[in-house]
C-alpha cells in the first residue's frame, strides 16, 4: 500500500495541501508560507530572465535583463516532512519515501525552471543527494518518528515584459516506496 501526500507551494503563491488519507500511515509535506521566498518587485525585461534563489536565500540574476528592485536576500524555501501515527512500524519506520517536485507554469508570468536541493536533516538521501533538475525525483531513507527538513533553492524564469510581484507555483509529492 502506498501513501501519497501532495502539496502545492509557491513563491508569492498560496500553499495548498491535497492529500487522500488511507487507513495507513501518512507522510505530510509542509512547504513555506505563501510569500516564501518572494523576489519582490521586478522591472520588465525584453528577454526571458532567470533569477536563482540559493538554498541560503541569496538571489542572483543568471541571465536576461529584468531587474529585481531589492538586493535583499529572501527566506529560502524549506520542506518539512512528518509521518502520521497509524501503522508506523510498517511504513514510516521501515519504508523509503520518494519525493517528486514539479513546476506548474499554468497561469503564471514566471515559472520555476530548476530545483536545487540543499541541506537535509532527520534522514538521508538514498544513493546520494540529487543533482539539480527541472523536475526533481529522489528517495529518502525511512524517516521514523521524527521530522525531516529539506532546504532547496530554485531558478525562476520571468517572461519578457513582465513587471511587478513575481508569482510561481510548484508541486511536491511524497510517496512510500
Residue ranges and their predicted role:
Residues 122-141:
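Extended, solvent-exposed segments with strong compositional bias
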Residues 19-20:
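N-terminal signal peptide c-region/cleavage motif recognized by signal peptidases
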Residues 7, 99-101, 107, 122, ...:
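Intrinsically disordered/low-complexity terminal segments and short unstructured peptides
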Residues 1-11:
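Bacterial N-terminal signal peptides that target proteins for export
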Residues 112-120:
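Short, surface-exposed beta-strand/strand-loop-strand elements in extracellular ectodomains
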Residues 23-106, 137-177:
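N-terminal small/polar-rich segments of proteins
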Amino acid at each position: 500500500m502506498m501513501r501519497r501526500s501532495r502539496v502545492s507551494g509557491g513563491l508569492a503563491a498560496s500553499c495548498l495541501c491535497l492529500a487522500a488519507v488511507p487507513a495507513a500511515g501518512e507522510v505530510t509535506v509542509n512547504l513555506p508560507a505563501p510569500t516564501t521566498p518572494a523576489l519582490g518587485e521586478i522591472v520588465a525585461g525584453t528577454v526571458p530572465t532567470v533569477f536563482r534563489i540559493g538554498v541560503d536565500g541569496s538571489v542572483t540574476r543568471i541571465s536576461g535583463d529584468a531587474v529585481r528592485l531589492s538586493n535583499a536576500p529572501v527566506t529560502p524555501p524549506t520542506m518539512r516532512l512528518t509521518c502520521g501515527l497509524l501503522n508506523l512500524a510498517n511504513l514510516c519506520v521501515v519504508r523509503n519515501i520518494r519525493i517528486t517536485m514539479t513546476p506548474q507554469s499554468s497561469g503564471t508570468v514566471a515559472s520555476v525552471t530548476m530545483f536545487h536541493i540543499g541541506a537535509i536533516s532527520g534522514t538521508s538521501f538514498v544513493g546520494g543527494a540529487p543533482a539539480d533538475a527541472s523536475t526533481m525525483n529522489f528517495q529518502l531513507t525511512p524517516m521514523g518518528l521524527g521530522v525531516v527538513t529539506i532546504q532547496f533553492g530554485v531558478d525562476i524564469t520571468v517572461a519578457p515584459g513582465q513587471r511587478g510581484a513575481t508569482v510561481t507555483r510548484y508541486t511536491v509529492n511524497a510517496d512510500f516506496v
